[in-house]
Amino acid sequence: MTRLSFGRKFFLTFDYILLSILAFLCLLPLVNVLAISFSSSTAATANIVKFWPVDFNLKSYTYALSKPEFSDAYWVTIKRVLIGTPINVILTMLVAYPLSKDDRLFRWRKYYSWVFIFTMLFNGGLIPWYMTIKTLGLIDTFWALVLPGAVPVFSVILLLNFFRGIPKEIEEAALIDGCTHWRILWRIFLPLSAPAIATITLFALVGHWNSWFDGLILMNKTEHYPLQSYLQTLVISFDLKIMNVKEAELLSQINNRTLKASQIFLAALPIMLTYPFLQKYFMKGIVMGSVKG
Amino acid sequence: MKGLFRRELPFHIMVWPGLLAVLIFSYVPMAGVVIAFQKFIPAKGVFDSQWIGFDNFRFLFQQPDFTQILRNTLVIAIAKIVAGLIASIGFALLLNELGKAFFKRTIQTLVYLPHFLSWIILGGVLIDILSPSEGIVSWALGFLGINSPFFLGSSSWFPFTLVLSDVWKEFGFGAIVYLAALTSIDPTHYEAAVIDGANRWRQTWHVTLPGIAPIVVLMVTLSLGNVLNAGFDQVFILLSPSVMDTGDIIDTWVYRMGLVNAQYGLATAVGLFKSVISSILIITSFVMASKFANYRVF
Amino acid sequence: MTNIFAKNRMITFASLALSISLVFVSACSNGNNSTSGNGGALKASSSADSPSSSPASVEANPFEKYEPAIEITTVRSTSARFKFLDGESLDNNAWTRAYENELGIKVKNVWTTDEAQYQNKMNVTIASGDLPDLMFVSPAQFQQLLESDQIEDLTTAYDQYASPFLRKIMEQDANGLMKKAATVDGKMMGITGFGSIEQGTPVIWLRTDWLEQADLPEPTSFDDILNIAEAFKKNHSGAYGIGLNKDLFGGLATIEGIANAYHAYPKIWLKDDSGKLVYGSVQPEMKQTLATLQDMYKRGLIDKEFGVKDGNKIAEDIMNNKIGLIYANFWHPLWPLQEAMNMNSADGMTWKPYPVLSADDQVASPSTTIPVTGYYVIKKGYKHPEAAIKLANLQLKNAWSDEAQAELYNTDKDQTPFYLYPTISMEPPSKNLEAGIAVTEAYQAKDFSKLNEEQKGYYDNVLAYLDNNDIKSFGNALIFGPGGSEMEVLKKYVEENRMKIGEFYGAPVPTQQMKQATLDKLELETFTKIIVGESPIDEFDSFVEKWHKLGGDEITNEINEWNAAQ
């Protein structure tokens, strides 16, 4: 290690400070949500909670966790993530591998590519989409949450570009050794593009975790809603124009900010926690030459 | 010829499962774009709704405020794309320079958090912190002797506020791709550069940037597909009557149209209009990249 | 990074862009009440024994049980408000059991979805052609289903089976508008979902502790209101004279009541001197209203930042002692005033409702609409169309008649909202007003023997608040008790025949479908700019001109054609 120059030191200090400030600014809203979730409902409605709970209590958490809808929805989402993410990742790898080849090696490559890219650009809208899924008999089934988005085309294109960065020589050597393409994908491309695979896994995970609209439209029973669809029904702003006495009585219960805050936090927690685990794949570089086919 | 096909067969087999999925779930429903040319009424269905040719498109283009809405959409979307790219790449590069792994991981986790809060939540927070009379931003600006503008209520500041808050919310998540790309650079390249006597700036210039260039080009190309997507959720939550002239975008317009009656035909037509523009831009940049840089983006 | 979720975003966008919110239904179901007047609200009573006015063919037992039981499929919107007893659900509760045991009707919910997505899901259901036997549709969907001949004529079923109570609501309450609204070419095509006319009116809510502090008398004119606003702003640091939300109309802290002071009736359709329906927001009286608002803003009586504040932000300001004067609906003591009281009653906070006040010597008329929320319809070809009538009969009997069992069918003491679960849900349009009058009378006589179970609940609240100073009962007490909004304000509106009731309640006319959104934007944008002084008051004249040119004239013609056809 050579001694750091003054300029370098100055730059690093600046860098540390800048990034710390940025991270701090990004943390604040979450701290605010957390503080609200532990506050009394009155304090939250009056919006006097900043970064520390006012009238600390755990009521909203005990209430949220006691609601069967919440745990049901949580379970649907966990199932969806556990089944949907591997489907996304495997299909993405299978499609990206051949499409990363040279046109000389795979002459259909360019046609296939455009077939996929086209789907990123055009869609037929809500009603035809619903009708297709209905015709297949998937309405109100778990598979309606997983199959329609089975191929995340954005991830395919991303992975395809990462695959291209892998030196051709490795693949050629493996072919000469008699490896099949299946084996090359599995034993060489997969380990060599760990950061990229981690990225598309994260995208698939976050995508499944966050999507709510498909649940609301494709599920016929509220028990089948995934978590974000359920949360959507809580977070949506109240229409103050159509209100009768009974509804108004319940408004203060439903419009309860502490309850919303606790559920938002509980819903975001798992996905925030997964990141540090996937992170290690972004952290250390991979030495191309060291992997043997 | 047959030999060629046999050689390529594993490639075909790999593509087919994914191909099947997009054929069923993307291409079949795509036939539904025909309702862009209909006065679509759900009770009549696709086959019995009235055909009206390009009326839906004409209706869109003839809106008295169409040029204003289109300009707002383009300005906000392009500013978001550019600022977002710069922020994400800049952040990834700055983070990459740091040595302490724990610090890096903590920072990276924290900046990715706002992505998981919806605009419905953040909207209320923004109104508070940006309030000229009692917001924290106005307090901070006052400290510097600056009079706080009405960020959310003044037409001239509104687009700026949209872009800045969107970049703040998404840059951490957007940086993931670049961090992955940085990790994929072969460390032997750096070792070689060091042996050649390159300092950090030169290493960044000659190794790091070329190393992530393909991913940057890819992201730029794909983001062109969004020049007409200015971010419905955010704008919808923050829009108010006093900033309509600079804040109203195509998506909020379609939403308001839908409030009066379900305008599926019109919404599909707008979607198709956006798709066509996006396709033209993406295909153009694809062709340019392959012509001038001999680089195939897809 | 905007591009990562290109695909997701498309879906999100599609959803939001296409979600047809229920907001519209209420916003645009203005009304036609050609005889004008009060909608006969006070004549209503929830007794089930008023005489039948129907020239019924063969009258049958309205509660006749099916043997063997029949099944009816339907679809439902659900809500975060739902709360069930242990082991119960939407498919198994007091209502489903009553339907099955008393009527022999098994209700099957084919799908349920959150209320925010109900219209969207209903549209895809209609488009896929897979209609349930019974469904609740918006006025626009009602129109579509009529045109494509997909719904059943209920005339005979209604004539035979409608209970006297149902007939009274459909044909007598609100001047018979509920039946009229569902009748097309002499045929009754559905059962109208209906709110309450008088409850749509604006009410002035005033902090009386601040009023006393300022040593001002109770307001009797709009000038008094301006003085009070001035005093509130001066006396309380950080406070505004009057609350105003960014959408100006509908909800908490609006301008309708202020417009009414100048005899302007924005957002609704009323007859002019020639008998033609015209739009209230473009009448000259509106210009005066805006001039006043502009002046109030200039004098600092209105929050400089109101342009970004929605109802929730207004609620915060009320709780934090920044607003002591608003124009809003009758029910706001329940929210946010209740919360504000929980927080501030120890410091003396009190509120009181007042009727809208006039800026001149003519009495001010509060504006409101005919609240058609939608229609219950039966799919064409369903074998038992009369089942819909029977479901309505039973619901009215169990929930609102003299035989009602509120504990079982409305709300129990744990606030389980059973009233949300009936398959067809109706209520007498003036139920709350009657409750307010009855409860107040009972309180004054200290005799609650004549109250029904629901009213007894309000009576207990009134007693708790007025006699025992129980702040938690403030909300209901200030609506139903003496001095409450029903008694002090709505009753006066109705008895003195003061309401201006919007007379258009049909589905959006063709030009509205295409141009209403543009006109609404123009209106809101212009009004806001005038209020904050960015545009001079004369901008109103060019707005009116533009409004007519950009589609207003066509809409006016179409709405008058609609009116002629009624």
What function would you assign to each model-found segment?
Chain A
Residues 1-293:
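A hydrophobic, multi-pass inner-membrane permease signature
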